UniProtKB/Swiss-Prot annotation:
PTM info: Methylated by PrmB.
Protein name per the record: Large ribosomal subunit protein uL3
Keyword field: Methylation, Ribonucleoprotein, Ribosomal protein, RNA-binding, rRNA-binding
Matching PROSITE patterns: RIBOSOMAL_L3 (PS00474)
Annotated organism of origin: Herminiimonas arsenicoxydans
Length: 224
C-alpha cells in the first residue's frame, strides 16, 4: 500500500485480555477487550507545513522523571500529559481540520459492526527450533534413527552454488514482531470505560500496546 494514502483516524490502546459475550440469539462470541481511553492530540500536521495531513496522538502516562527534555517540551507545547506511545495517523485535510491540539479522541470514533485493523507485538517465544518455528515434521522416533529426531535436514546443495540461500527456514528467534490482524469486527463499545470489544484474537500479551485503525481491505458482502 502507498504510504501516502489516507488510512483514516485511528486510536492507540492497551490489550486488556479476552472474554466472551453473548448475542441476542444466545451465540457465544470470543472478543478481545481493548482500552482506548485518553487518546489526546499532540500535533496536527498540514500539507503547507509538513507536506502531508496527519494527526499525532499520545496514549498512556509516564512519570515526568522518565521523559526526556525533547519529549517533555513537545507534550508541554500541546498542553497534554506525556504518554508512553506517540503515533500519527494519515488523514484527509478536512478530517485533520476538525481536530485541534489537546483534544481527546473517544472510543465513539468507531461504531459497532465496523471492521478495523489491529496491530500489536506478538508474544516472544525466544530461540526456537524449526518444528515450533516453521511447523517442520519431526523425523522417525525409532527404526534406524539415531539422534536425528528433530533435525531440520539439509540446508544447502552441492559445491554449486556452495552456499545457503537467503530466507532458508532455520532455527532462530520466534515472536516479538509487529503483526496486524485485519478486518476484525467491533462487537461492542463501552463508552463509559472507553473500551472496544473486538471479535476474535489480537496479537500480543495482556497489557500490550495496540493500534486500532479503520480496515483498509474491507471485504464486500456476498450478494451486495
Amino acid at each position: 500500500m502507498n504510504q501516502n494514502q489516507d488510512k483514516g483516524q485511528g486510536l492507540l490502546g492497551r490489550k486488556v485480555g479476552m472474554m466472551r459475550i453473548f448475542t441476542d440469539d444466545g451465540d457465544s462470541i470470543p472478543v478481545t477487550v481493548l482500552d482506548v481511553s485518553n487518546n489526546r492530540v499532540t500535533q496536527i500536521k498540514t500539507p503547507d507545513v509538513d507536506g502531508y495531513s496527519a494527526v499525532q496522538v499520545a496514549f498512556g502516562s509516564r512519570r515526568a522523571s522518565r521523559v526526556n527534555k525533547a519529549s517533555a517540551g513537545h507534550h508541554a507545547k500541546a498542553g497534554v500529559e506525556a504518554g508512553t506511545v506517540l503515533k500519527e495517523f494519515r488523514v484527509a485535510a478536512t478530517a485533520a481540520s476538525e481536530l485541534k491540539v489537546g483534544d481527546v479522541i473517544a472510543a465513539s470514533l468507531f461504531e459497532v459492526g465496523q471492521k478495523v485493523d489491529v496491530q500489536g507485538v506478538t508474544i516472544g517465544k525466544g530461540y526456537a527450533g524449526t518444528i515450533k518455528r516453521h511447523h517442520f515434521a519431526s523425523g522417525r522416533a525409532t527404526h534406524g534413527n539415531s539422534r536425528s529426531h528433530n533435525v531440520p535436514g539439509s540446508i544447502g546443495m552441492a559445491q554449486d552454488p556452495g552456499r545457503v540461500f537467503p530466507g532458508k527456514r532455520m532455527t532462530g528467534h520466534l515472536g516479538d514482531v509487529a503483526r496486524t490482524m485485519q478486518n476484525l469486527e467491533i462487537a461492542r463499545i463501552d463508552a463509559d470505560r472507553q473500551l472496544l470489544l473486538v471479535k476474535g484474537a489480537v496479537p500480543g500479551a495482556k497489557n500490550g500496546q495496540v493500534i486500532v485503525s479503520p480496515a483498509v481491505k474491507v471485504k464486500a458482502k456476498k450478494g451486495a
